[in-house]
Amino acid sequence: MQTLANLLNTIPAIDPAAMSRAQRHIDGLLKPVGSLGRLEALGVQLAGMPGLNGIPHVGKKAVLVMCADHGVWEEGVAISPKEVTAIQAENMTRGTTGVCVLAAQAGANVHVIDVGIDTAEPIPGLINMRVARGSGNIASAPAMSRRQAEKLLLDVICYTRELAKNGVTLFGVGELGMANTTPAAAIVSTITGRDPEEVVGIGANLPTDKLANKIDVVRRAITLNQPNPQDGVNVLAKVGGFDLVGMAGVMLGAASCGLPVLLDGFLSYAAALAACQMSPAIKPYLIPSHLSAEKGARIALSHLGLEPFLNMDMRLGEGSGAALAMPIIEAACAIYNNMGELAASKIVLPGNTTSDLNS
């Protein structure tokens, strides 16, 4: 039987030789060197991922949406009723939410996973990995036990690996849960060492006159639970939530298969911070989709060393940004595989790294 520690030890390193070969190939394509900017760097990054066998390509695509409620909702940190989590999860099964529409446009499947929705019975059409009916209220207790966090991580890692066996080569992460920007801010504050006031934002349109209470709740949660910033599982268990644990599991699972995973917004940055504490080897597999409009986004991304490809003023969550960015991954693969080569043409660009072919 696989353990979390064993799976973390299976995460392969990026292949530098494959990346060097990819860089030489891209430099020789029918264009000035570097003229396709970050698409070129993305192609090199993908080539280094062992799960893609040295050739950037996209097979099946999947967005995994982790759905859970949060006990900290009781502290008045969100204006949406808690029941919206279950209602929106049901809407996802009908394909009518933002992530579902964007994923369909990108040709990706959406996997809606119940890891902790507060309903008496499981919701039909959802993948049931429910740990409990919502996490603990982090302002007065830990979100969950370490054992619960480790088991959910392992379950999601195994589910992700099974999808990879069935042909998924590009993963996206998403979440759904009222009040979940509060535990996300607690995670970001803990791991980055920044004060809660610097990272707590309005989430889903929280009135600004309620922001001080939200900041205070995050500060109380950290003071009470004393999460260890060096221990990603501890941070998730103390001040996180089941949806955040689930997203971290997708990242770890994809990386263990040597495959890329697209981050979404602020919630996914928080999960990534915790996942990287568990295994720094996953960082090269993380691809940032968009810059979240949430207040602490830049702080989290700076700590991760990541620069998003898109800035659309989005803060919906759900995995919407990950779905929106999937065509960018496909574009990087397309230029790598389909562009002609300078060597096969009569174009010579000696030492030229800046000029346009048409100039």
UniProtKB/Swiss-Prot annotation:
Belongs to the CobT family. One of its GO terms (molecular function) is nicotinate-nucleotide-dimethylbenzimidazole phosphoribosyltransferase activity. Homodimer. It catalyses: 5,6-dimethylbenzimidazole + nicotinate beta-D-ribonucleotide = alpha-ribazole 5'-phosphate + nicotinate + H(+). Keywords: Cobalamin biosynthesis, Glycosyltransferase, Transferase. The lineage of its organism: Bacteria, Pseudomonadati, Pseudomonadota, Gammaproteobacteria, Enterobacterales. Catalyzes the synthesis of alpha-ribazole-5'-phosphate from nicotinate mononucleotide (NAMN) and 5,6-dimethylbenzimidazole (DMB). Its EC number is 2.4.2.21. Signal peptide: none annotated. It comes from the Bacteria. Pathway: Nucleoside biosynthesis; alpha-ribazole biosynthesis; alpha-ribazole from 5,6-dimethylbenzimidazole: step 1/2. It holds the Pfam family DBI_PRT. The gene is cobT. This is Nicotinate-nucleotide--dimethylbenzimidazole phosphoribosyltransferase. The active site is at E318 (proton acceptor). GO terms for biological process: cobalamin biosynthetic process. InterPro entries: Nict_dMeBzImd_PRibTrfase, Nict_dMeBzImd_PRibTrfase_bact, Nict_dMeBzImd_PRibTrfase_N, Nict_dMeBzImd_PRibTrfase_sf.
